[in-house]
Each structure stands twice: as C-alpha cells, then as structure tokens.
Amino acid sequence: MEKSYITKDCQLFTVNQMKLWPQKKWKQIVLVVVLALIVVFVAFATFAGLLLSGAISREVVSEIDVLNPDGDKTALVVYQPGFSSFPNDVSYAFADGLASSGWRVEITTASSEAPSDLSKYSLLTLAYPVYGGTVGTAIVKYVDRISDFDGVNTVIIACGGGDSGESIIPLKQQVEAANGTFYDSLALSNSNSTALESARQAGSSITP
C-alpha cells in the first residue's frame, strides 16, 4: 500500500507503507513462535522471581530438636530452609558432628520462635541457603533479634548451588557488630557429593 505526499514546492512523491505483519506464511509462523517464546520466558521469569523472593524471605517455625542431651556444653544450630532439603541436611550433619565431639546440641529453624537469648550457649551456628549471592532474609532477621551475642563463638554455613562464600561476609559483619565472635565458616555446594560429610567433619572438629 502506498501513501502520497505533497512537499512545500508542490512536488508529489509516494512512500511505501511498512507492514509489521509478514505476508509470507512461513514468516508468520516464525513470528508467532518467537512471540510465544517471549511470552513464556517472561512468565517463567516472573514466576521464578516470585518463588525466589519467597524462598529468601520466608520464616519457618519448628520445634527445637536436642542431640546428645548429656553433652558437656550446649551449642545452638539455627538454619533457614531452602527450596531443597540441602540446608536442612547440612545443618543436621554439622549438628551430628558437634554431638559426636561431646556437645549438647539444640537445632531449630530461623524464626521469631528461635532462641534469641544466647546466655546458656557456648556456640552458635547459622546456616542458610544462598540464591543469587543473597543471604536468606530469615537468618538475617534472626540475627537482628539478638541484641547482644555476648561474645559467643559463631559458625556460619552458606549452602548454595555454586560458590556461596561471598555471602558469608555481610553476615559475619552483622554478627561481629552485635558483639559476636566469628569462629569459622563453611561454604558448601549441593553439587558436591561430599558436602554432608564435610559438614559432619567440621562439626566434629569443634570440641566443647
């Protein structure tokens, strides 16, 4: 289709009107497929973003499990669950290691119900999932609720799908700002088949 225009000097010229919709059938099919893929990608990205936001920020209330009730000193393990059971499995493996070395271990999830008075604990362990290099909000909020760590030795465990070590730094600074003593840290990947054994050995290496 053409449109005609008259210039200031009364000259007539025509310009082909561009059409966004292709005329050939195969081009129409290709365009439809591309548009459909874009819509699916945007929808998936939005859904994944909502899921990720929920996993990072959600708090899960749970009972306090006690391992080795007759241990010499008491250690508290607080962890934030993730999409998979990996943070849970790592936390319990570490707690098992502590119990095997003589600790009485209390383990629970990061929530408003988790102990915030650390006066009876000689060791605190904070474990959390890492998504996009971000520390889980629930574990950060839990640390915020502790007004004074009273110098308690603190272990930080980052659980991710890759290198999650960088996420430890801001949480370490947060603990130290609240009068906590940074003791050690672990960055474990769920792609490592020996991750749980590494967590267990790390726990067993800490004596009461």
Per-segment meaning from a language model:
Residues 112-114:
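Short acidic active-site motifs
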Residues 10-108, 117-128, 132-208:
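FMN-binding flavodoxin-like domain, especially the glycine-rich phosphate-binding loop
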